[in-house]
From Swiss-Prot:
The keyword Zinc-finger belongs to this UniProt entry's keyword annotation: no
Gene Ontology biological process terms in this record: NAD catabolic process; NADH metabolic process; NADP catabolic process
Cofactor stoichiometry and binding remark: Divalent metal cations. Mg(2+) or Mn(2+). Binds 1 zinc ion per subunit.
Family: Belongs to the Nudix hydrolase family. NudC subfamily.
Binding-site list for substrate: 84, 127, 140, 208-215, 257
NCBIfam families: PRK00241.1
Annotated positions binding a divalent metal cation 1: 174, 194, 235
SUPFAM superfamilies found in the cross-reference section: Nudix
Gene name for this UniProt entry: nudC
Pfam family, one: NUDIX-like
Protein name as annotated: NAD-capped RNA hydrolase NudC
Length: 278
């Protein structure tokens, strides 16, 4: 976080009065000309399709809550903005706040009823958990660990693109950790599945919260060992070796994918190493 700690995650009690509130639905936030934070009591007086309310932390010392709405209704003078645009542009502290609020909102939406007996779940005061009053099932906010890796071969990097990417952009390889495997095993497996090559000498670089919708990206560098590139059908549109002096359009600066690439470039050139945002 930034040095002034403008945003701090937490659990301010919903029973207390006042504070700021964010309105969230489908990974979008309500905003007007003054921004995304609204006076809490005022916004709650509007006719909103409210599913849940949770305290999410403090912004500049003031409590912040998120209202999870059933649908993104229209309100005069307001519009809905996607979370991803705040990742790419603007204040990074604000993005951290929105990312956390989005994850809590989605968790609240998906756990309104017990998956075991169907009883309505209840939020608990002592920790961030939804509990079933009937059978006692606990549901904590979901976190999905994913690996992301830059595969290198000297002055070349292996980059790929998914059909879902912005046209022309190539990125590092990524995939979810499966049950029963370590993150390192996931790296080797995903690289083999997505592009058909073998890697070794894995180096853990760092992690980044990725609230789309609830991933934790664990970044690695890996060295190429053997194999020819064979893109995975339906997952990888194209994959190539790129020279460091002839790279294609790359992911956004704030992403861990871009950090892995920039870090390798810095190490090969002897330049100062970049710092991973967050």
């Amino acid at each position: 976080m930034a040095g002034e700690f403008r945003w701090q995650a937490g659990r301010p009690a919903t029973a207390q009065v006042g504070g700021w509130v964010l309105a969230h639905c489908q990974q979008r936030f309500l905003q007007d000309d003054n921004g995304l934070l609204f006076p809490r009591e005022w916004l709650k007086r509007q006719e909103l399709p409210l599913l849940a309310e949770h305290g999410v932390g403090h912004w500049q010392g003031e409590p912040v809550y998120v209202l999870e709405l059933d649908e993104p209704i229209e309100l005069p003078g307001m519009a809905w903005a996607p979370l991803r645009q705040f990742m790419l542009h603007g204040d990074f502290d604000q993005f951290c706040m929105l990312g956390y609020a989005s994850q809590i909102g989605i968790w609240a939406r998906h756990n309104r009823f017990c998956g075991n007996c169907g009883t309505r779940m209840q939020a608990q005061d002592h920790e961030r958990v939804m509990q079933c009053p009937q059978c006692g099932l606990h549901q904590y906010p979901r976190l999905s660990p994913s690996m992301i890796v830059l595969v290198t071969r000297g002055d070349e990097v292996l980059l790929a693109r998914s059909p879902r990417f912005v046209p022309g952009v190539y990125s590092t390889l990524a995939g979810f950790v499966e049950a029963g495997e370590s993150v390192e095993q996931c790296v080797v497996r995903e690289v083999r599945e997505e592009v058909g090559v073998e890697v070794a000498n894995l180096e853990y670089i760092g992690s980044q919260n990725w609230p789309f919708p609830h991933s934790l990206m664990l970044g690695f560098h890996a060295e190429y060992v053997s194999g020819e590139i064979v893109p995975q059908e339906d997952e990888i549109e194209d994959a190539q070796w790129f020279s460091l002096d002839a790279l294609p359009p790359l992911p956004a600066q704030r992403s861990i994918a871009r950090h892995l690439i920039d870090l390798y470039l810095a190490r090969r050139s002897g330049a100062a190493e970049p710092v991973l945002p967050g």
